[in-house]
Design a protein with these regions (language model features):
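Short conserved beta-strand and strand-loop elements enriched in small hydrophobics
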Residues: 26, 71-76
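A generic structural signal for nonpolar/aromatic side chains embedded in well-ordered alpha-helices
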Residues: 18, 65-66, 120
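Charged, gly/pro-rich active-site loop segments
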Residues: 2-5, 79-156
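Short Pro/Gly-enriched beta-strand edge/turn motifs at strand-loop
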Residues: 8-10, 20-25, 126-128
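Short beta-strand segments
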Residues: 21-58
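Compact nucleic-acid interaction/catalytic patches
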Residues: 50-72
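Cyclic nucleotide-binding regulatory domains
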Residues: 61, 66, 77, 82-84
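Extreme N-terminal tail/first-helix region
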Residues: 1-19
Length: 156
């Protein structure tokens, strides 16, 4: 990272930013171009590693690319604010962002799917308990992204 003073490494601060973000963009490579998909997500941290969870249909471009090339990048951001100045060159934007790379793998078992969907729902509706019908678990793709790299930056 070029501006080391903007780098955030404190796990509590990273968790705070993860919780504030409401969309995670996942970048897939199809061999010719990047396909960027905004997705709802959930997350968890265990053993110092971050895991992101996503869900989606079992068909379509995203599902096909997840099978074809599971190495992906991701980005999420929040806390945006334009900072004006007297000169155009002085304008800047405040933001908080998290970026990284990892492998997107499908959850295979009903238990893994439940765990992933629980993480997604906990992100958007914390403190509530949800049940998912077996039929829904069977037809919903749930993906786990184990972050191999993760960086966090805050530009005040």
């Amino acid at each position: 990272m070029r501006r080391a003073e903007l780098n955030v490494t404190d796990p509590a601060r990273i968790a705070e930013i993860l919780n504030k973000c409401d969309c995670c963009r996942v970048g897939f490579w199809d061999g010719e171009e990047v396909y960027l998909v905004p997705m709802s997500f959930g997350w968890e941290k265990a053993g110092g590693k971050y895991t992101l969870w996503f869900h989606g249909a079992g068909e379509g471009r995203k599902a096909a690319l997840a099978r074809q090339c599971p190495r992906v990048s991701f980005e999420m951001d929040c806390g945006h604010g334009l900072r004006g100045a007297e000169m155009a060159c002085g304008f800047t934007t405040a933001y908080q962002c998290i970026m990284g790379t990892g492998r997107l793998v499908p959850a295979e078992t009903a238990e893994d799917k439940q765990r992933g969907l629980d993480a997604v729902m906990a992100h958007y509706a914390p403190g509530q308990t949800w049940t998912f019908p077996q039929e829904m678990l069977e037809r919903t793709n749930v993906y786990r992204l184990e972050a191999e790299t993760l960086s966090c930056k805050v530009h005040p």
